[in-house]
Amino acid sequence: MKRFTVCCFSNPIHKNKNHNPDKKLRNSMEISRNDNGEHAKQNNNNNVTPIIGSDRTNVIVNHDFSLGTHSWHPNCCEASIVTGDSGISHGVLGPSKCGSYVVVKNRKETWQGLEQDITSRVKPCCLYKVSATVAVSGPVQGLVEVMATLKLENQQSPTNYQFIAKTCVFKEKWVRLEGMFSLPSLPERVVFYLEGPSPGIDLLIQSVTIHLESDPERERQEGVTVEDENLVVNPNFEDGLNNWSGRSCKIVCHDSMADGKIVPLSGKAFAAATERTQNWNGIQQEITGKVERKRVYEATAVVRIYGNNVTSATVQATLWVQNPNQRDQYIGIANVQATDKEWIQCKGKFLLNGSASRVVIYIEGPPPGTDILLNSLTVKHAEKIPPSPRPAIENPAFGVNILTNSQLTDGTTNGWFPLGNCTLSVAEGSPRILPPMARDSLGPHEPLSGRYMLVTNRTQTWMGPAQMITDKLKLFLTYQISVWVKLGSGINSPQNVNVALGIDSQWVNGGQVEINDDKWHEIGGSFRVEKQPSKALVYIQGPSSGVDLMVAGLQIFPVDRLARIKHLRRQSDKIRRSDVILKFSGVDASKLSGATVKVRQTRNSFPVGTCISRSSIDNEDFVDFFLKNFNWAVFGNELKWYWTEPEQGKLNYQDADDMLNLCSSNNIETRGHCIFWEVQATVQQWIQNMNQNDLNTAVQNRLTGLLNRYKGKFKHYDVNNEMLHGSFYQDKLGKDIRVNMFKTAHQLDPSATLFVNDYHIEDGCDPKSCPEKYIEHILDLQEKGAPVGGIGIQGHIDSPVGPIVCSALDRLGILGLPIWFTELDVSSINEHIRGDDLEVMMWEAFGHPAVEGIMLWGFWELFMSRDNSHLVNAEGDVNEAGKRLLAVKKDWLSHANGHIDQNGAFAFRGYHGNYAVEVITSSSQKVLKTFVVEKGDSAQVITVDLQGL
């Protein structure tokens, strides 16, 4: 069996991953094979030599100092040339063996060294490779660092410094320093320089080269880059491990393993990442210079696992990106549950928003001690998928129940069957009225029969009545579920009752309720099927074994979205519009009588915002869409504690600062999400490990640090996220901690409205967070003195049905607090249906008087928390769902045309917000003025001064 190995050694570096806030700081030093077979110690992300076509013209003038110090300048120090015949030695290889070199001496600071202006010889967005031969002389003890750096100067902004590379140098030995850089834009002046050793140590430089490695613009013009070109070199290991390295572990090339039981799925070889001590250890390749920003790539890896008695584990493809400002970013491309039995494909897409000085793709994931096997890896420009057409749904039969014998009118359970060995029978005495949510959808309806199914002899929670509905479902139709349920006597604890659907092997939640009494309860839910199932059934389940279940009037019917929106338009007119009378002054009324008036609303005051991320704002196209279409923002992760303090005492507010600066400079209001997160899985390990006293101190420091830093800058704060679903801080610090968090936050920033925030409030799917539980939770906080000022409904919803959402809003509205949808997203594989869902949710919010704003949880493909939920494709094309967003927002703008009456006035009815009015007199004189229609129920009289017309 052939074996080739590459080894490495590691120390901890920071890995900032959204999906895993507990990654620790780590640095990696690896030993990788170089061209002559020797091994050299290098940084973990510096050990791959990219194989890229290049222009060999050297950017550096006088690269070998054969012209003395021509074009070179010492930076606040001195420099002199040592030639081969000088007879001078600095303890390194003699000049006769290495030729001329420069000595940089009398250095008083580490940054002092030798520099050259290269402004006229570099271009933006190109990749350059730097190679320098350096040494040190003088009072050297141990290793000395030498660095290559760029100084970027602009007259109108502070000087920036871009790190290129560094190497460790021993005394009396020449060492090669290599690295790469790319400039996203060209500053007024670019200076390359070498620096680094401690003061008093001389820096010796034999030669410096900077070569163009990649010019994307030229390659596009010459047709060098083709759509199906694989960016990965040696993707199938036909050339052994060339161009590959271990990410802080050893990698081995095999043609077989396990006595021939493991062989390549394709090709003749595969690689194994072995001796892994961290889950992020794996196999990697550098693809710097090959990846264009704002372009979508698809990565496909064929993987499996081996060893350590692990038979199944998550394997992930990840991209490490280093930006020119040295900010690291980790992008999760795809993950798959791999086994030790067979090869499996791990496939996903990625996009770089900003410029990158380094890009490395690697495979990671399984627990330490388990080998990752990689058969092949490809990275190609992703094909554009054409949008799917709107589904053709014939005869949707809105409001028609698809179930058989729902009313049990013949006194039998015909059409139903027991799931399990329970017993079904028919009894009388159930409600004859429709459940409220169904009544809102169906309107006037004949009474129910009053009969119900009694389910007895239940020995498992899943036992209950069931019915096959495979042939009755239509793809892409949204169905509403409605039923009355009741439990038999003898229950001694709260019981969940659930309407469930079995769609092939998938469980679908059709609604749940918690019951702790002997009354009838409504269950309301919804679902949609987007792929033809081979088997579909509906069943009712949930109570403990031995508890009898009663089911009455179960209905499943398609909902008429357009009819609901028509109703919501009328409702919105009542609460979001006002009668407006424009009174024109400053000009004689007789001159204005009959003048033409054109009123155009420029901005609706109803807040519509979105989630953004630090990496996204590096993408100009993203920022353009964001600023044009949203007036509020929330940060996806960058304000969360696990992001701002991943390790104790190591604070990172820079990302949040950058995002806040973008928003404030463009008059975008912001929500602060979130100060704390009550779910334990989201809490950093260093916090989880604290004792009670230390944790209490850390909580107070978090409040003080965050709220003082951003005082007055965030309009809202989600104080302690998802308290209905988590209890970490309450369990550790007692019940009063939640109230104290609110009190302290209010003391530190009285201007901010403090919100509770949770999920599954509006969809009937989770008894833990039904509106009644949320109300109870809020009242409990308020009674103990917590200044709760707003209700956050996250809104991660599937197949929304208006009356179900509205029912939750009505119940929460009794508290009199402003309600916001704080993280709204919808999902469908069909863009048109996704747009339908978004339209439903936007109108339900806009049409309800208790709702005061909507925040989308993102809009850009590859930067969403849910699949098939984006509104704009990754390369900037607005899809059908995005077009629906724009159409709804356009509907929320009022326009009016007419003439000024004899009293110098013009009346219209319009949505609240900002307006422009153009007045054109009979003599064709024009004037343009602006005004604001404020919220209010009564008619508003607004004076418009036309003086000067």
Predicted regions and their residues:
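Aromatic-lined carbohydrate-recognition surfaces of secreted/lumenal glycan-active proteins
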Residues: 607-613, 719, 741-771, 820-823, ...
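Short, acidic/polar
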Residues: 614-627, 697-706, 768-781, 835-844
